Curated annotation (Swiss-Prot):
Gene: ispG
Pfam families cross-referenced by the UniProt entry: GcpE
Cofactor(s) needed for function: [4Fe-4S] cluster
Function field: Converts 2C-methyl-D-erythritol 2,4-cyclodiphosphate (ME-2,4cPP) into 1-hydroxy-2-methyl-2-(E)-butenyl 4-diphosphate.
Family: Belongs to the IspG family.
Keywords: 4Fe-4S, Iron, Iron-sulfur, Isoprene biosynthesis, Metal-binding, Oxidoreductase
UniProt protein name: 4-hydroxy-3-methylbut-2-en-1-yl diphosphate synthase (flavodoxin)
InterPro entries from the UniProt entry: Dihydropteroate_synth-like_sf (IPR011005), IspG_bac (IPR016425), IspG_bac-typ (IPR004588), NO2/SO3_Rdtase_4Fe4S_sf (IPR045854)
Disulfide bonds: none
Positions with a binding annotation for [4Fe-4S] cluster: C270, C273, C305, E312
Length: 369
């Protein structure tokens, strides 16, 4: 039963992406991106709904042309979660999705074109209260910066970002957030550190093209974990070559590990050894699948023996310590003994019961004011 995070977050300007606050004192938002064909409205809506069920706060959708812009408009009408339109090169696409109700525009002012085109996009955003995300990526730096630095560097990423920030500020536009992504962890981390000292706008964190499910999860957890532990970051996106729903799960797991945001169960489980009195790995795998729908923040300890079991169980809402028989703890106190027969069934029942009690207690507290 872990308490508040000791992390002191960087103070940033609050903006709104649809109904979701970003920056300031708002919770760190978890974002993902669809990988379906935007013109396939049904498939994209289905994917967004799956992301919403997983807990996503904001979803980015690629809008490469005008046909996709019209499809985006239909998608927007069919989903509840705020949508970011990812736009490059053609400023008219940005103007169209602004008319269609987009919640945020992800652009790179450097590839939109002339000053009058950038101004048109900014004016459309301002008129409709739409924020902008400036997205800088190590793989697409401006040619003059590539020539100046020779290769992508943290300083090059930050110079590119500040160039675009100044561009928007010249147009008297302040409702934006910024990202400076790279596939190299150290480059991205240092770029965000430098940028955090230069601007007050919210920062969107990500390690771009991080890799597949396993390798990308590790790289993102290391890179984003370093920044979040320093208080840097207002939204996160875990870029994985995998089902986008996995990005949301990993994002929440990173935030949970730093006590920055809680959603669902925080499992504490031993890796198991020959001292285990039940199959820890099998038990954990079954519990994670069965309890995936549970959104109530709970700490659940699953420890195979009495070496560390009692200590971990005493710190959890629900704890299981292996023994002969096994011992269940509720709110840190021994509650009942269990054999291995129907162990997962009974543990699931107790966890759901505890979750219901927590929901009722929280509701009563709110009602009392």
């Amino acid at each position: 039963m872990h308490g508040e995070s000791p992390i002191k977050r960087r103070v940033s300007r609050k903006i709104w992406v649809g109904s979701v606050p970003v920056g300031g004192d708002a919770p760190i938002a978890v974002q993902s991106m669809t990988n379906s064909d935007t013109n396939d409205v049904a498939a994209t809506v289905a994917q967004i709904n799956r992301l919403e069920a997983a807990g996503v706060d904001i979803v980015r959708v690629s809008v490469p042309d005008m046909d996709a812009a019209e499809a985006f408009g239909r998608i927007k009408q069919l989903v509840k979660v705020p949508l970011v339109a990812d736009i490059h090169f053609d400023y008219k696409i940005a103007l169209r999705v602004a008319e269609l109700g987009v919640d945020c525009l992800r652009i790179n002012p450097g590839n939109i074109g002339r000053e009058d085109r950038v101004r048109a996009v900014v004016d459309a955003a301002r008129d409709r209260g739409i924020p902008i995300r400036i997205g800088v990526n190590a793989g697409s730096l401006e040619k003059d910066l590539q020539k100046k630095y020779g290769e992508p560097t943290p300083a090059a990423l930050v110079e590119s970002a500040l160039r675009h920030v100044e561009h928007l500020e010249r147009l008297n536009f302040q409702d934006f957030k910024v990202s400076v992504k790279a596939s190299d962890v150290f480059m991205a981390v240092e770029a965000y550190r430098l940028l955090a000292k230069e601007i007050v706008q919210p920062l969107h964190l990500g390690i771009t093209e991080a890799g597949g499910l396993r390798s990308g999860t590790v790289k993102s957890a290391v890179g984003l974990g370093m920044l979040l532990a320093e208080g840097i970051g207002d939204t996160i996106r875990i870029s994985l070559a995998a089902d986008p729903v996995e990005e949301v799960k990993v994002g929440y797991d990173i935030l949970k590990s730093l006590h920055l945001r809680s959603r669902g169960i925080n499992f504490i489980a031993c890796p198991s050894c020959s001292r285990q009195n039940f199959d820890v790995v099998k038990t954990m795998n079954e519990l994670e699948v069965r309890l995936e729908d549970l959104l109530v923040p709970l700490d659940v300890a699953v420890i195979g023996c009495v070496v560390n079991g009692p200590g971990e169980a005493k710190e959890a809402h629900v704890g299981l310590t292996g023994g002969t028989p096994n011992l269940i703890y509720i709110d840190g106190k021994p509650s009942q003994k269990l054999t291995n027969d129907n162990l997962v069934d009974e543990l699931e029942r107790l966890i759901r019961e505890k979750a219901a009690q927590k929901v009722a207690a929280d509701a009563a507290l709110i009602a009392r004011g």
